[in-house]
Amino acid sequence: VLLTFPFTRLSYWVKNYTKGFQLLFKATPKLPDLLNMVNIQDATDPMNVKLGNSSLKNEMSYDVNLLFSSMNIARQRSQSLRLGYTYRANALAMGYSYDAHTGVRKYRADNVNGNWNASASYSFEQPLDKMKRLSFGTWTRVEYVNSVDLIGNSEGSDYQASRSSVQTTLLDETLKLDYKVGSSSTMGVKISAAWRNVDGKAMDFDHINAVDFNYGATVSFNLPWHIQVGTDLTMYSRRGYEGSSMNTDDLLWNARLSYTMLKGKLTWMLDGFDILGNLNNITRMVNAQGRTETFVNALPRYAILHVAYHFNMKPKKH
């Protein structure tokens, strides 16, 4: 049975919503796959045997977020602080065991407990000069994740999945500086870094202490004849991973050319992504269990043409 749980929000604002806080609570249920609850053994593939588990329970995810925000309209200054906590009860996981003598793998769905994460983030943005052309922004986030899952076991012929507990500490920081030239042109620079520390209790767990960082610049300006040009150049780098394929440097260049006609109603836009062709179509990342996952993107470099038409429809007067 799947019950519906309400979404709760408590808010308090002062001075025309320029200062205040919000408390958000959400409970999200998740049903297990009914096929996994059928207590039978599926040996259609004799080397990969699926076992049923009639005692599976519903997964419940509880999210609590507290948000403080403040805005000074005259100085165009804004700042916010967010605190978050998530707990997953009876999380659904797929475990397996491997018999080294026969080569048979047995797997089934189970419930695990102990998955939770806590986070805090702070953002701040404000102009630095009286003309409000030069603005500074920063965003900071720290997060701790306790991930519990099931991993394979190669001892014996019976199903014996093992519990895997992995702790991850994340620290992100982003700094940006933007400058307005006139009323329609802007330029800016940005630098961002994310430190990741992953540790597990298993004897064969490979500790991870790595940094992902990027830095670059953006420019957008208007040309005569209703032409607009925008471009950004960013270097994406990763350091500290054990595998050399994870420690990479990728220079990404994107650009957009747009043309407006019919008094601003019709806009043609041509976007170019990864113009230099430096991105690899294979992406590697580390998940919450400290394992490397590989994804393949078939179209890393492309150009696309957009057409947008803007119109207003006024209701008829009766």
Predicted regions and their residues:
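Exposed, low-structure sequence patches enriched in small/polar residues
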Residues: V1-H318
